[in-house]
């Protein structure tokens, strides 16, 4: 469960290391985001020669949460960190590599590029 002010790791090679959620998209009073939801983030920590720099505001999709997600068969998948992948204005990832596992819940038409770049899909 990601909410406003939550800090997330970045699971791609866009150049950002840490981002902070500034808005959960999808409704005027929506409070929480889970895996597969799009949020508005600001870059808090970045590497020197990356595609993004500190202070940039962009969209991101949540790919891992500590809270976890429940599957229809009753199983729960939790991760050790909260992580997101940065998106451009067309909702496509700006990075060319994804680090760490992602979940099958991202397998919608919108995020198939992330699934194909990920090293492991749980």
Swiss-Prot record:
Matching entries from Pfam families are given as:
Ribosomal_L14
Could you confirm whether the keyword rRNA-binding appears in this record?
Answer: yes
GO MF, any single term: structural constituent of ribosome
Superkingdom as given in the UniProt entry = Bacteria
Has keyword Metal-binding?
A: no
Tell me which Gene Ontology terms the entry assigns under biological process.
Answer: translation
| The entry's keywords | Ribonucleoprotein, Ribosomal protein, RNA-binding, rRNA-binding
Question: What GO cellular component term, any one, is given?
Answer: cytosolic large ribosomal subunit
Cited function? Binds to 23S rRNA. Forms part of two intersubunit bridges in the 70S ribosome.
On subunit structure and binding partners, the annotation says: Part of the 50S ribosomal subunit. Forms a cluster with proteins L3 and L19. In the 70S ribosome, L14 and L19 interact and together make contacts with the 16S rRNA in bridges B5 and B8.
* Assigned protein family: Belongs to the universal ribosomal protein uL14 family.
What PANTHER family does its record include? Answer: 50S/60S RIBOSOMAL PROTEIN L14/L23, LARGE RIBOSOMAL SUBUNIT PROTEIN UL14M
In its UniProt entry, what is this protein called? Large ribosomal subunit protein uL14
Q: Say which species the protein is native to.
A: Acinetobacter baylyi (strain ATCC 33305 / BD413 / ADP1)
